[in-house]
Every structure is written in structure tokens, then in C-alpha cells.
Amino acid sequence: MFSIVRKKHLLENMSHFSQLPEFEKELSKLSKKYRSLEEDLKKLERLLIINPVGMGNNFITTHDEPLVKIVKTRLACKSLRNRSMRVIYAYHDDEVTFVYIELYFKGDKENEDRERIAQYLKNNLF
């Protein structure tokens, strides 16, 4: 039990969240329409500190390398009631950093922008 609490404490103090410029634009646009979105994103961050790649059916690892994992997750948004947003993020295990890549409402867009993910990986793996 002590080791779990210690690990959580270390992750809380070491973890860092950042966003791609495209993500910031999407967040700004969607936050105007869905007022609870920023608060919901903070809840996701608290969850990711405990379990960086998530658990259960709401988290799908789409790219898994030793240094970086790309994860697609369902974000419950209070403003949407029974529906949800999708968040694509990169988790850098060596640095304990999270980079938000994409945010979209499943009702507006069917799938993630794979070109953006590929570009992110190209720029950050080499």
C-alpha cells in the first residue's frame, strides 16, 4: 500500500501536461459550446496521474513504443449528458509527460486525425 501511495505522490509531482497548438484551438472552440469541458479535462488529468495509459474499455492504446504511447480515450463531459468527447494524447514514460494531441466530439467527427498523430510521432521519436 505504501509503495502505491509513494508512486502516486511521485507522479503527481513529476507529471507534466502540455498541448499541441491544434488541440488548444479545438479546446477553445469546444469550451464555448460545452461549458464543463475544461473541468472535465482536469478530472481526466487526475485520473491519468494515477494510471497514465488508463484502464478499461474507455482507453485504447493506438501506438505502443518503449518511449511513447498514443492513447485514445473517451472523456465524459457533463455538458453532453450521456455522450462523450474523444481525447488523443501521448504519454512519454521516460519523462512522465502527457501531450494532448486531439480533442473532438464523436457526433461531429467519426475518427481521429491519423495524419496529425503520425506527424507528432515523426517529430518526437527521432
Question: Residue ranges of each PLM-predicted region?
Answer:
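Conserved beta-strand segments of the P-loop GTPase G domain that flank and frequently precede/overlap
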Residues: 101-104
